[in-house]
Amino acid sequence: MAALAVSPPPQQARSRATRRRLLRACVACLVERGLAGTTTSEVCRRAGVSQGALFKHYPNKDALLAAAVEDLFASLVADYRRGLASVSESEDRVRAAVRLLWQIMTRPTLQAVFELMGAGRCDPALRRALEAVQIRHRENLSAAARELFPQVPGDASEFDAMLDVVISAMQGASLGALVLSDPASDARRLEALTALARRVLGEAAKKKS
């Protein structure tokens, strides 16, 4: 007989649900109103909880923002995995991987996060809170990339450098697109990044064989 799934205690389930509402409300507020308009009172209003409930889970606004960003990063990595898993064997996997990453990088939710990171330049407390999240996110991205491209050996430092270049280039281009949209330049940039990824992956496969 199969074991029955054990449900979390009601209080624990309610706490998780409250945190989920707060994090989603925080991200939505960042997208719609920017950092200046993302106040704890507005987040609570959207989430349908009291400020007391918010501060029970997150000691301050910076902690809330960092948690919201980390939760968003996790969902975006999951989206990327699902998207690349749907690529057929007949398709160009490297090209699809680069273009899918660009689609995610230009989502309004992630562009709002870039704005938040920029604000950390003049806010040491916010910068420290986001720094830890960013480090974990980069580690998760690297792990996901290696799973999606198993031909890469474990000690392929050039692959890690390529991944960093691709992500950094896309982040910069995504920020620039907020002010000046240039689809032709975007297309050329994606072709260059695809060529770089293809070369590095090809060399990594040779080293592993």
Report residues per predicted region.
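N-terminal intrinsically disordered/low-complexity leader segments
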Residues: M1-A17, V179, A204-S209
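Residues in soluble alpha-helical coiled-coils and helical-bundle/repeat scaffolds
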Residues: P59-A63, A67, A85-S88, R121, ...
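Amphipathic alpha-helical packing segments from all-alpha helical-bundle domains
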Residues: V77-A78, R82, Q103-F114, P124-P150, ...
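Short, basic, alpha-helical segments at the C-terminal edge of helix-turn-helix-like DNA-binding modules
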Residues: E70-S75
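Hydrophobic alpha-helical connector segments
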Residues: A67, A78-L110, G154-V166, L190
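Hydrophobic/aromatic-rich alpha-helical bundle segments in the mid-to-C-terminal region
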Residues: R127-E131, L148-V200, A204-S209
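Helix-turn-helix
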Residues: T18-R21, C29-A63, A67
